[in-house]
């Protein structure tokens, strides 16, 4: 019986694996979902060679999408990960520990960057047998390069490694570094879950517009434009949100009537409670998925 010849794709993958072995700045992604794809897209747009990026993704449709971007996508971990200087963990938190088992033998010298919600660096360090761990909390606007990511590094991470992480996550938007890991749970509640709050209010404004006689499409367009414009105004202004709000709120006017109604309904206090619930869930996820 003859030996089957490798396919063109298999031959190309072997060649690329050999090329990566000589690279000192290769990046591996464990998980190839939306956030990983956003980071990869940002890296490629800024000139990172596709040959320097490899992804472990078990699902064939996701691998196919990644291959269209020109990066190497494999269904499982292997020796090709030995070439990675940075490993980005973009897996669901409940899958992190199991996913780490076949990877850690190949990546002990790498810097590890986790975007998995809730999993603390202590757990990640233990699972991967490495102290070079950075934890990130991005948000979904990263998918269009408009995100914000908060970062925390363990003490053993060098300034050069922190700079590299800033470069990588900066491809998806802004970055900030935190002093303590506990602050990441607050960030999760604020900006991590924050886009959902915005969408929630957009939905409410659309429904209110429809109830007042506007077509749904127009109501939604007005709401979205208002959020974009107000957000940009807040970004460029040196004045706090309270002052900006007061400037729109004339005594006895329409905005004053709306704000008074919201204050009577304790909207602000309810919003704080909602964010605290998100923070507590982030804490619980760290205990639930990272205790082993």
Question: Residue locations for each model-derived region?
Answer:
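Internal alpha-helical scaffold of NAD(P)-dependent oxidoreductase catalytic cores
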Residues: 124-132, 148-186, 199-236
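Small-residue helix-packing motif on alpha-helices
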Residues: 53, 80, 215-222, 244, ...
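Rossmann-like NAD(P)(H) cofactor-binding subdomain of soluble oxidoreductases
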Residues: 40, 54, 60, 69, ...
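NAD(P)-dependent Rossmann-like dehydrogenase/reductase catalytic/cofactor-binding core
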Residues: 21, 224-292
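Extreme N-terminal basic, low-complexity initiation segments
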Residues: 2-10
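Short pre-catalytic strand/loop immediately N-terminal to key active-site residues, enriched for Gly-Thr
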Residues: 133, 183-189, 241-246
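NAD(P)+-binding Rossmann beta1-loop-alpha1 motif at the extreme N-terminus of oxidoreductases
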Residues: 10-75, 82, 127, 210-211
